[in-house]
Amino acid sequence: SYPVIKENSNNVELLIPKASFRINPGDMKNHAKTDRAINANNIFSVNRLSLEDSLESGRSLTLGLDYRNSNSENNNEMNIKLASVIRDDVEGPIPEKTTLNKKRSYIFGSVDYNKNDFINFEYNFASDNNLADIKYHDLGIGFSLNNFVTDFNFIEESDLIGSAHIIENTSTINFDDKNFLSFKARRNKEINLTEYYDLIYEYKNDCLIAGLKFKKTFYQDRDLEPSEDLFFYLTLIPLTTIEQGIDENLYK
């Protein structure tokens, strides 16, 4: 890669073109239906398909472009990535959801924006070759104010990638540098159902993490009632984690 640099007194801008050629004359196992995800952050990885028993078959050329804008303190305020894969022939054994099996894959992109400590923005997407139809959205927005941090995530999939439509939230209150209270929830808009919510208290120091977690899980099946579980867990750094469920009769 050959970066193009533009620098002034307030910021530094980098434009980095990327290219990677791969060839595998051998065969690979059939992973056409294997669930794998490609994005702008892993598309140049050596084992981007995360397969342990096969190498990606065929010949391919991965092309990409990175843009970075850093301020005078060398903090990245904005990162933009675009990448796509072209190949000379269709490769059936490659996971279909990735579209890397096609002669021209989807165009994968990401945008990260961190102007200040109060708000951050992250967007990942996958589009058809003409950038006319977005097949995948993953939008994350985070807010931080004093000891309160909350993150929202919106995921929408279509076509080969999937059919999910998810909204997630994680919120944390830091009482001090050792005591934390977190809330997590996930709603599936496709079936109009809240999948779960968690309420977690944690105590952390250099040697251990101790926590109490209440988890409520909902079900789409009308024959199954929502489940409520209370867990105590202890992590000894860096050795192991112990988790123990608490009898529901003690808290109901």
Predicted features along the sequence, with ranges:
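Outer-membrane beta-barrel translocator/pore domains, especially the C-terminal barrels
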Residues: S1-K252
